[in-house]
Swiss-Prot record:
Subcellular location per the Swiss-Prot or TrEMBL entry: Nucleus
Gene Ontology CC terms: nucleus
Region (Disordered): 447-473, 588-659, 693-751
Biased composition (Polar residues): 702-711
Protein name: Pre-rRNA-processing protein RIX1
Function in brief: Component of the RIX1 complex required for processing of ITS2 sequences from 35S pre-rRNA and the nucleoplasmic transit of the pre-60S ribosomal subunits. Regulates pre-60S association of the critical remodeling factor MDN1.
Acidic residues: compositionally biased ranges: 596-628, 733-751
UniProt keyword list: Nucleus, Ribosome biogenesis, rRNA processing
Gene symbol of the encoding locus: RIX1
Amino acid sequence: MSLPLDVILEDLESSPKSIIPILATLHRDKAFLNDISKTDLKHLVSRSLNLSKSHIAYNKWCGINLIKVLSNNYNILANEGVNFMSQLIKILENYNQSIDPKILSSTVECLNNLCNQIRGKPTLTREVLTPKLPTIITLFMEKVAYQPSLILRSLNSLIRKHPTTFRPYGNKLRNRLIELLSSESYSAFPQELKQIICETLATLPIIEKTEPEAKWQGDIVDIVKELSQVLLIYDEFLSLNDDSDLMELFKKIPRTRESEESESSFKFASLEIDINKPDTIFQISDRVELLLSIMKAYLLSETQFSVRVPVGLVLIINEIICSISTKFVPFRKDIRDEKVKKLIKSTTLLNQFNSIKLLSELPIKYQGSLVPHLNNILAFLEILIPFSNKKIDYQEVLSNEIFMCRLLECTGNFISLVSSLSDASLLIRFIDVALCLVEERALNTSPVSDGKKQNQQANGNKKKNKKKNKESVPLSDLLSHQHLFNETIPLSTLNATRRFLNMVITRVNLPPTQHYRVFRYMIIEATVAKSYNKDQNISQELKQLLINSVLYPGFEKNSMLPIITSLLGDDPLLSVFNNPRFPPLPTYIKKSGSVIEDDEEEEESENEDEEMEENENDGSLNVDEESQLESSAKRRKIDISESSAGGGSDQPETVLPGIVLEDTKTKEKIFTNVNPDSVIQFAETSEIVEDVVPEPEATRTEVVTKSSVGTIPTPENPVATSVSVSVDKNEHDESDFEIPDIDVGDDSDDE
């Protein structure tokens, strides 16, 4: 519901009782500001500016937000944009620590909105924004200590949108950011602030006048060099030279020359580590975390120019971080203090955790570029899994549960780059870790009770106390209600494990042992979800895992479909397995005769059908329609004619009779020797010729020519007839051909 203009103007004349309805009316009703008169509009703008000039914090805040809403209207922005910008800059200049922080945040947000509304409009940009940009940048850099996250995000936007204007302020901002990164309180900064500092630093190469891509790549190399120098500090505590592979990796890192040290983009203070002050050892892990955060910002932030990313160099430095571990590299002999050893081990774990956070983001950004390095990445991630006596250290896995979940997430991200992975041995240990994390966790017996038990065994020869043993009461509860003493697995751990297993079973053919362990876990999860979940609320990760267990059964002979269907009965994919919906079967159309090649043959086939109907009516042939079609398809047609070389011969055409056998499957055709004196020639025209063979054993046979292809009645005991036709030797074909005699049986007409 919008307020009338008179009410708004009256309320803005002094301190507004409630600014929210006024702001809602001006923001939602787009036609409100277009329909009011110029006089009322001038009153509205002037009273908003007067409120922003007030010394009362509430009135100032109301005036700033009114300017923000009014600037969304183009007509007001074109006429009053300069006044709005000048008033906001004045508020920003006069801000100090004694003023309410909300005034600063509202002013910065209003300036950002005003710049966004003006940007892209050439006239307004030239007249309003461009002259004020240097002042805005300077004030933002001066006030960055009051609202660092908000102001740095605003500066980051100005760098991207106005790199040329920002160029004179680039070095000053870089030094300011390096000071923030080097401060002792950096580790206590909020994670959001750390991220925006690194992103702003990674955006600065865009202001370079020439070759910004070379500057960007040089910064990446400088970060890698700085990391290698920090990691070499561990050589004072660990015997790094004993690991030849590790030293080979260090040699692949470019060396920093003395002349290049002054040109390095990242100049941090030197680390002061005292072995007598073990807490100073954490400076190593803090510096590694800082450098990895900057590298992450460089690798993930978008640029307006093409860059060459040294992916191999980035992976090498991460492999070095993962390889520096007390499991593989022994301590030096002069390091004997157990406290120092534990602190060094803790710093290496922190370094590895920060490295995994960086590696987890790379597949999302670079995708296929990492596939050639996939086996190498999985290999050095595998060394992070704790082992004891060639088995996974269960207690160590649980004590570093967050680290292990992040490791599984990182591994799953790299597996997702490929559709299938042929070498399943690379993932066996990761699967074992995942299954360890989701096993039931029973609460261990406390050390106090263990100590008492040992004391009781040591003093067994003493007189037993006749008093009632009070310790038996809690022990009885432990035996009778053991399920109440199981530790609950965190939901984040369950989701991370399910996502990893879901990624594995869809891309890898696991060995039988790991396959059955994974499917055993899925059956247990499905049974628990069915029996103990009254609301049938199933997480998305578990739902996807159960569906994929049906789609990718692997070695499983018995399907999990019945159990999963009882849980996910409404799933459309599972309904296809339960009620298959196949397409209709194809319908075969019977062919009705021989293939017709042209229109003439089509007409002949019609005549043929008429003849067949007449024969059926006379009762001469008692066969059904299918046998007629079959005999018609199998019939052989032979046309015989005579023609002279000069074309004047009166010799009539002679056509060879067509013979159709009664049973072609049981009777064989026996051919006689060909008589070279007999020649057969096909006639150019065709007609039905009835010929009577003078031989006593032959019967009258109806000969079929090309013009009639109907069904021919066959006598019960047909006798083959040989017809010999003599043709003049002057014909083109001088060969002789004799129609063979066909013996169809021993029976004759005499019987």
